[in-house]
């Protein structure tokens, strides 16, 4: 087992999430979350050995300041000299990258080239990457793309039915997301079931505030619900998912809304929040629906119905169904949603085992269908940080 540790960074436009992992055991030795970056009240919270403490970043409230504070914290715990490499989550690698890669100047230029595909995320990833390069001098950096797993999708799945010059000129196509999670979960599902992943036709539902679903066959992505951006597909916490594109023209004409306003509404004010008028949090929606709140009940019903429909279509893309896999915060913990979704899927030969479904929560993996089901439904907790750490160690030669 390597004695060197892996630092994993995930930078947002105003946040930085980090973790120091032992790549061998998967143990997290230190984690941090910086928020309100680029604002006067920026801060970072560190967690070590179960203890949390907060550090003010107001003197240097940007991504570099956050990484500097992280370096000081590592020194305080004697961990700085044990870091062997740094892994970075990057949202979009477009069509340029079908796998994780060691960072050099050419890779940085490639990430810059993909900024139009992820205008909020890729610039932030670059800030974190440059900060890591300057503060952790001489250490290898590896980038792991959310999109790379989906580069195996066939043309019929990733192309939009629009004039093809838009694809050729602007890269207008479906890229998908959550790829690092899908890669980890596909491997874990095969291991858990004692099968070779190349022999499993899987439909994997990554359900969190952002939610998507992917068909996996021969260990590869065959289709996925998110598209050019993460707005396409399932009903999500605040995103609408699939919607008639002419909504833009309709609202511009009738509600006097701009493209930017409509885009923000569909991304940040729709989904469970928009339908219920209450919350984007699935736990709150479930609780209020149980109390009889009409908006919450409708939000839950729509979330489940859309998900069940997509599972059917992804079974087509996978060429059949051997395993339906639930992961992500909602997928791993909501026995209610899993049971109701499987209730739609009797035609695929799936029948819920209620006792097993209740047990498979709070980090517990498990098969949740009956022994006589034609396929299995299984809950597999995801671990994107560990997948990034594995890639980083491998590509850095650790």
Short names for language-model regions:
Residues 2-7:
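Extreme N-terminal starter segment of soluble prokaryotic enzymes
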Residues 11-12, 89-92, 207, 321, ...:
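Glycine-rich beta-strand-to-loop/alpha-helix junction loops that act as flexible
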Residues 15-60, 227:
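Short glycine-rich, Thr/Ser-proximal phosphate-binding strand/loop in the N-terminal lobe
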Residues 74-121, 140-142, 148-157:
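Short beta-strand-loop/turn "lid" adjacent to the catalytic site in phosphate-handling enzymes
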Residues 151-253:
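Glycine-rich phosphate-binding loop of actin/hexokinase-like ATP-binding domains
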Residues 217, 223-255, 264, 328-360, ...:
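Catalytic phosphate/nucleotide-handling subdomain of diverse soluble enzymes
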Residues 264, 271-275, 282-317:
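Adenine-nucleotide phosphate-binding core of ATP-dependent small-molecule kinases
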Residues 297, 301-321, 331-398:
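Internal helix-turn-beta structural module
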């Amino acid at each position: 087992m390597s004695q060197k540790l892996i630092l994993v960074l995930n930078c947002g436009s105003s946040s930085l999430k980090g973790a120091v992992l032992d790549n061998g055991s998967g143990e997290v030795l230190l984690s941090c979350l910086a928020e309100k970056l680029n604002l006067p009240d920026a801060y970072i919270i560190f967690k070590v050995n179960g203890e949390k403490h907060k550090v003010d970043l107001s003197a240097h409230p940007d991504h570099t300041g956050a990484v500097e504070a992280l370096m000081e914290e590592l020194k305080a715990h004697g961990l700085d000299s044990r870091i062997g490499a740094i892994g970075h989550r990057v949202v979009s690698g477009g069509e340029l990258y079908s796998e994780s890669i060691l960072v050099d100047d050419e890779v940085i230029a490639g990430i810059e080239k993909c900024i139009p595909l992820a205008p909020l995320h890729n610039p932030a990833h670059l800030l974190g990457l440059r900060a890591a390069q300057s503060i952790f001098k001489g250490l290898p950096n590896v980038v792991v793309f959310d999109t790379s797993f989906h580069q195996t999708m066939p043309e019929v799945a990733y192309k939009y039915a629009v004039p093809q010059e838009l694809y050729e000129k602007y890269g207008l196509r479906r890229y998908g997301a959550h790829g690092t999670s899908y890669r980890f979960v596909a491997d874990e599902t095969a291991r858990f079931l004692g099968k070779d992943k190349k022999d499993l036709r899987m439909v994997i539902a990554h359900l969190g505030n952002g939610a998507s679903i992917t068909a996996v066959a021969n260990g590869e992505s065959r289709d996925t619900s998110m598209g050019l951006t993460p707005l396409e597909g399932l009903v999500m916490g605040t995103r609408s998912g699939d919607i008639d594109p002419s909504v833009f023209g309709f609202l511009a004409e009738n509600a006097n809304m701009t493209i930017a306003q409509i885009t923000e509404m569909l991304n940040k004010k729709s989904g469970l929040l928009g339908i219920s008028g209450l919350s984007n949090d699935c736990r709150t929606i479930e609780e209020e629906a149980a109390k009889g709140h009409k908006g919450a009940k409708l939000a839950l019903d729509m979330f489940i119905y859309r998900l069940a429909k997509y599972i059917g279509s992804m079974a087509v893309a996978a060429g059949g169904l051997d395993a339906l896999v639930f992961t992500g915060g909602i997928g791993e913990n909501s026995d209610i949603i899993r049971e109701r979704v499987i209730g739609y899927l009797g035609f695929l030969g799936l029948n819920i085992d209620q006792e097993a479904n209740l047990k498979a929560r709070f980090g517990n993996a498990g098969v949740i269908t009956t022994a006589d089901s034609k396929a299995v439904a299984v809950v597999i907790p995801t671990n994107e940080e560990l997948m990034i750490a594995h890639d980083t160690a491998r590509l850095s030669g650790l």
